[in-house]
Structures are given as structure tokens and as C-alpha cells.
């Protein structure tokens, strides 16, 4: 059995090719999903990649969440399909109501493009089960609206339920409580602002630490 991982492309998506390459790198079959698709083509998991979907008009992810393919993603996620949102994809998942909170302008209002260290705060998700608790990952961060914010009670709930998945070592964008990524209550949906798909081999990225997310979901799919 080969796991099929759907990779969504919206107008303005930049990192779909990189996400597909990461899926292939771990032995999965990437399946292209266009924003207007009305079905998910039988995939086992979905990646909503980074970029500037629909030009980030209104606000990042606000239009993409209404795309036909997202209707299918929301339904599939609520039935337990693993979904990963990276950067703009994280913003889309928050706009779609699959993850709590929102992403807003970085502190200082500057676009940040840096390799950053993350700590794995939870291994109890479909996308982080391969990691050791508190593992450190080196991955690229590239965003202008990457500051994670949520009401205090939501942040407390995320902390209390172990749903903070990644934290920044150095908080460059001002995210509340150093949060770089969070999960849904069932751990099947994960969003993070940095880019694991750009850290899949030392030749082209700062590390191969990002492969762990893709191996994790592959393990889950193959285990049935």
C-alpha cells in the first residue's frame, strides 16, 4: 500500500511543489488537488501548503477557506483525516475553523525569512508521532503574518490539553506563548507557521528535520 497525500494548490500558492517533493521523499504518492476540486480523489491525508492564496486579499487565508476543495477538507478532517497546514495553510485552517486562534502581522511589521529552531511540544498528533518529546528542529520561517494570537482562555485550553505542538526557541514574530504550531482536539489536524517541507535534506535546506512530519503521517496511514 502506498499512502496518497493530497497537496492543495490555490491561486497564489508557492510551496505545493515542495510539499509534494517531501511526500515523495518519504515514499508517499503526492496527489495534486486544485482549489476548485469538489472531491479529494481518495487521498489518505491532505497538506495545505504555504504561499499567498488569492493574494492574501481581505486577510491571509480568508478567501481560500471558501474554495470548493476546502469544503471537502473540512468534512474529511471532521471524519478524522490527517490535515497539515503550513504557513498560509495554517492561516487557512484557522479561517476554516479547523484550528483555534488566528495569525496576524509580525511584531515590528516586517517580513521574516530566517532558519529557526523549534521545540516539539507534543508528539501525540498524526504529524509528530515520529519525534522524541522536546526534540529540536531547524526549519525555515518565511512570513509577514505569522504571529499566533488567541484569547487567554483558548491559550489556556490549548496548553491544558497538550495541543501546543511546536514552540519557538527564539520568538521572532511575537507569537503568544512562543507558539509555532497547534493541533485540533483529536490531534489529526496540525498547523504550523515554519516550513518543514523546506527542511527535508541538508543539501537544499538547513536540515532534514522536516521529514519527521511526513514520516509520522505515513506511519499512521500504513498502520491503518
From Swiss-Prot:
CC terms in the record's Gene Ontology section: cytoplasm
Catalytic activity, as annotated: N(2)-formyl-N(1)-(5-phospho-beta-D-ribosyl)glycinamide + L-glutamine + ATP + H2O = 2-formamido-N(1)-(5-O-phospho-beta-D-ribosyl)acetamidine + L-glutamate + ADP + phosphate + H(+); L-glutamine + H2O = L-glutamate + NH4(+)
Keyword Signal recorded: no
Pathway: Purine metabolism; IMP biosynthesis via de novo pathway; 5-amino-1-(5-phospho-D-ribosyl)imidazole from N(2)-formyl-N(1)-(5-phospho-D-ribosyl)glycinamide: step 1/2
EC number: 6.3.5.3, 3.5.1.2
HAMAP family for the chain: PurQ (MF_00421)
Assembly, per entry: Part of the FGAM synthase complex composed of 1 PurL, 1 PurQ and 2 PurS subunits.
Name of this protein: Phosphoribosylformylglycinamidine synthase subunit PurQ
Gene transcribed to yield this protein: purQ
